Amino acid sequence: MTLEEKIGQKLMLSFRSGWTMRDGTKISSVQTINDEIHEIIGEYDIGSVILFAANFNSDAKVNVELTDGLQKAAMDKDLGKNSIPLLIATDQEGGIVYRLTGGTALPGNMALGASGNTENAVKAGNIIGSELNAVGVNVNFAPDADVNNNPNNPVIGLRSFSSNPQLAAKFVSAYIEGVQSNNVATAAKHFPGHGNVATDSHTGLPSVPATKEELYKTELVPFQAAIDAGTDMVMTAHIQFPNIVTEEIYSDKKDELISKEKVVRIWD
């Protein structure tokens, strides 16, 4: 691959409401692929696309037509040189983070964790995975592997399985099993831990004063379980950890926990 092709493969694009086409036309919602999207994906060898709620339709057939069109664009040999199938992703955690219109409304992670039965997480993951697979989505940015150890956290809360690292770890593993049984990849998030914050990282930059040793005892426990369970990716958090150097965690766990090749970073 050329450098340009490698860059394209590392990019994950979103086509959402408010998107402006090259001719100045504004699109209110992108639920069908158009010629311009086809050209962008094919010409620049784009590797991934993320879909949000605005991209999904209550009619599953419309969703399938969208994902099928995206894949055809990626495989268009008249535009791109590689013709590599796309990763098509979404955030379908269950509970309050729910993108797939028409999908099954499931209890959130906190409710699953409170049940004490990891089989509930397997079943939830299986339902989510089967529905994503049915509409052509092959990556689920889930499970949320954060430990809910700050009651003032404005963005995680119900999305976490538990404030207990060991319990959260068991449910993270179970959820991964369910999703992956449907040939859908998982991405445990938000590494190295988004639970102990009091600021929403979508609107500010949280700072976590934990030391590396403290992270290994608490926040990293569910992520270790996720890796052991075979998660396909890990999504990083956009959070400050002033008492550690993130590279140390990558270095310490290069083979055991996480490799940079499987890290997903999100810019919105």
Predicted regions and their residues:
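N-terminal hydrophobic targeting/anchoring segments and the immediately downstream early-domain regions
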Residues: 1-99
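Second-shell residues forming the walls of enzyme active-site clefts
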Residues: 2, 25-28, 33, 59-75, ...
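Loop/turn elements at helix/coil->beta-strand transitions in domains of secreted/extracellular proteins
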Residues: 3-10, 44-49, 82-86, 133-139, ...
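A cross-family glycoside hydrolase active-site/sugar-binding cleft signature
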Residues: 14, 50-52, 89-91, 142-143, ...
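Solvent-exposed loop/turn segments at secondary-structure junctions
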Residues: 17-20, 54-58, 92-97, 139, ...
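Short, acidic/polar
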Residues: 22-42, 121-131, 215-222
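A substrate-binding/cap region within the structured catalytic cores of diverse enzymes
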Residues: 85, 113-137, 142-166, 172, ...
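Flexible glycine-/small-residue-enriched beta->alpha junction loops
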Residues: 99-103, 107-113
